[in-house]
Design a protein with these regions (language model features):
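EF-hand and EF-hand-like Ca2+-sensor regions
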Residues: 38-158
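Eukaryote-specific detector of the first structured module of a protein
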Residues: 1-39
Length: 158
């Protein structure tokens, strides 16, 4: 996996493209994310600035309520069997539903990098752990944390 794919700017670009730009027009518009758009559109750069202001250096609890709600909904959707744990199979399904990935081993490697010993004992990732990882994905400006792997292998948007 290319390490440049996990830098903060690329991670935020991924969030815009694969999580919020519903109609894939390259913008977050009123249809996608009404509360951020002052001119009717939110570019990736504008979204990055908003994320930087609202999320960098913050915990999940400090995120704005609408973002916390969106993250919780994302987890609920990913936990397909509703057992309160995000398993490897559910993680794989989440990853391949967003983008074509040639090698499942890349997804599996990302999942293993997310897990703590406690996660392994439990058999998956809990909602609170997912929240922590998501906060790290958006809120940590470097590429050193486990959270950078939350969405599996990322494309490089550079």
């Amino acid at each position: 996996m290319a390490s440049g794919c996990y830098d903060w700017g690329n991670r935020v670009h991924f969030v815009v493209k694969h999580l919020y730009d519903i109609d894939n027009n390259g913008y977050l518009d009123s249809h996608d994310f009404e509360c951020l758009a002052l001119d009717g559109h939110v570019t990736v750069e504008e979204f990055k600035q908003a994320v930087q202001n609202l999320c960098v250096g913050k915990t999940f609890e400090q995120f704005p309520q609408p973002l916390k709600h969106a993250i919780n909904c994302k987890y609920t959707t990913a936990d397909a069997n509703g057992d309160g744990l995000l398993s490897l199979d559910e993680f794989r399904l989440e990853c391949i539903s967003r983008q074509a990935i040639r090698d499942l081993d890349e997804i599996d490697d990302c999942y293993q990098r997310l897990l703590t010993d406690e996660d392994r004992k439990r058999g998956g990732i809990t909602l609170s752990r997912y929240q922590e990882l998501f906060a790290e994905f958006l809120g940590c400006p470097d590429d050193s944390g486990q959270g950078i792997f939350l969405f599996g292998p990322l494309p490089d948007y550079a």
